[in-house]
Amino acid sequence: MKTNYEIRYAAHPEDARSYDTKRIRRDFLIEKVFSADEVNMVYSMYDRMVVGGAMPVKEVLKLEAIDPLKAPYFLTRREMGIFNVGGPGVVRAGDTIFQLDYKEALYLGAGDRDVTFESTDAAHPAKFYFNSLAAHRNYPDKKVTKADAVVAEMGTLEGSNHRNINKMLVNQVLPTCQLQMGMTELAPGSVWNTMPAHVHSRRMEAYFYFEVPEEHAVCHFMGEVDETRHVWMKGDQAVLSPEWSIHSAAATHNYTFIWGMGGENLDYGDQDFSLITDLK
């Protein structure tokens, strides 16, 4: 197995206004989340979130304590949320085994123990997408399915944004230190998410897009309300959203995305909305 990681530094919004396409993609887009028998991570300075993916095929993959953590185990001072977006797989956390099927999630609390990822069937490998944030205490590990989620049905087909927001790793479902994660599924014929757009200065966010057909793409919108930028993305890619940035998208096909947040509070509704007509 191989572990790959990079560090991404935070940007001031006034500086980000001057970024060209190449710089925007370099600083915010995470193009390669999954590689066969590798663990890929981006250590972001936005609330020190780690965004990553593990794709075990022929090997069992270990969650290694990368050097920036300066810790004996990855989860020594961290909590983690994991979603399986591939074939059936297994996550082992210490002596506990969790079977995760497609679109099932797992919360791992802080604590010294080994964590490994493996696939049940190498011909249909699991793909474990994860977000991790600093944690001040331990909360119990817990598997969460869509049946456990707080579900909000939003939007309309006429507005091209009919979607179900599955709030899965949130404080209404289980206790966490600062991590919140969920999965939004857009209905056929709907392509817009998070519109009207909002920001939340108390929390950063990361989006991971999947269920995007190969011949289609997602146009993710970011930036300040009056200085928006776009990032064209494919399926199985992620993007970082600073606390000062909107995070929205339209696509050429319906899709699903996983959102993950961390920062000052656990209030999902703490959002500062902008009018659609104010976007520039």
Curated annotation (Swiss-Prot):
Q: Which residues bind Zn(2+)?
A: 198, 200, 205, 247
Name this polypeptide is given: 4-deoxy-L-threo-5-hexosulose-uronate ketol-isomerase
Species in which this protein is naturally found: Bacteroides fragilis (strain YCH46)
Q: Which domain of life is it from?
A: Bacteria
Q: Which cofactor does it need?
A: Zn(2+)
- PANTHER family from the entry? 4-DEOXY-L-THREO-5-HEXOSULOSE-URONATE KETOL-ISOMERASE (PTHR38461:SF1)
Pfam families named in the record: KduI
* Alphabetical list of InterPro entries matching this protein: KduI, KduI/IolB_isomerase, KduI_N, RmlC-like_jellyroll, RmlC_Cupin_sf
Reactions catalysed, as given in the entry: 5-dehydro-4-deoxy-D-glucuronate = 3-deoxy-D-glycero-2,5-hexodiulosonate
Main role?
Catalyzes the isomerization of 5-dehydro-4-deoxy-D-glucuronate to 3-deoxy-D-glycero-2,5-hexodiulosonate.
The alphabetical list of record keywords is: Isomerase, Metal-binding, Zinc
Q: Which GO terms describe its molecular function?
A: 4-deoxy-L-threo-5-hexosulose-uronate ketol-isomerase activity; zinc ion binding
Q: Nucleotide-binding as a keyword?
A: no
Could you state one GO biological process linked to this protein? D-galacturonate catabolic process
EC number, as in UniProt: 5.3.1.17
**Coding gene?**
kduI
Answer yes or no on keyword Metal-binding.
Answer: yes
Q: Which family does it belong to?
A: Belongs to the KduI family.
State the pathway, as annotated in the record.
Glycan metabolism; pectin degradation; 2-dehydro-3-deoxy-D-gluconate from pectin: step 4/5
How, per the record, is the cofactor bound? Binds 1 zinc ion per subunit.
